A protein has these predicted regions:
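RNA-contacting regions in translation and RNA-metabolism proteins
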Residues: 1-170
Length: 170
């Protein structure tokens, strides 16, 4: 019997990059790793519904740079940058509350995804949002397929839905 390897690990270095980029030794490595995992979980909860495709972290000796890729940067940034400043303050509070390894300087960069229909993570969030609004699952799937296939970059789409949809077992 063979073991299954996650496809993401095969793509690393070829078409994908690491989600965290830093170097640490022994105890420092453990602290950095714990900080990255907890901070990523916190940001995913905090930014739920804002179509965040990915969160990357880069660490150097003096800075921690958090890169948030989203299709709706205006929702995160807010009016005149108020939302970004509030997010930065919340991250600093979170890191001090859990005694996480802190860098002297924290930078939060927000990248816009130009075509959200070609990003699988955002498409999945759109489907989940439609289902949470109690829309019919067949309609949600058909609308999503039409929306995604209208994008020229996309060659095809495969959607898998499971569970009790419409009150029936699937």
């Amino acid at each position: 019997m063979s073991h299954h390897v996650h496809p993401y690990s095969h793509r690393l270095g070829i078409i994908r990059d690491w989600k965290s980029r830093w170097f640490g030794v022994n105890k420092q490595f453990r602290n950095y790793f714990k900080a990255d995992v907890l901070l990523r979980e916190y940001l995913e909860k905090r930014l739920k519904g804002m179509y965040v495709a990915g969160i990357e972290m880069e660490r150097s000796e003096k800075t921690l740079r958090v890169i948030i890729a989203t299709s709706r940067p205006g929702m995160i940034i807010g009016r005149s940058g108020e939302g970004a400043n509030k997010l930065r303050e919340d991250v600093v509070k979170f890191m001090t509350r859990y005694n996480l390894e802190q860098s002297p300087e924290l930078k939060i960069d927000i990248q816009e995804i130009k075509s959200p229909e070609s990003n699988a993570q955002i498409v999945a969030q759109m489907i989940a949002e439609g289902l949470e609004k109690r829309m019919a699952f067949r309609r949600v799937m058909k609308q999503t397929i039409e929306k995604v296939m209208a994008n020229r970059d996309v060659q095809g789409i495969k959607i898998y839905l499971g569970g009790r949809l419409g009150g029936a077992d699937m």
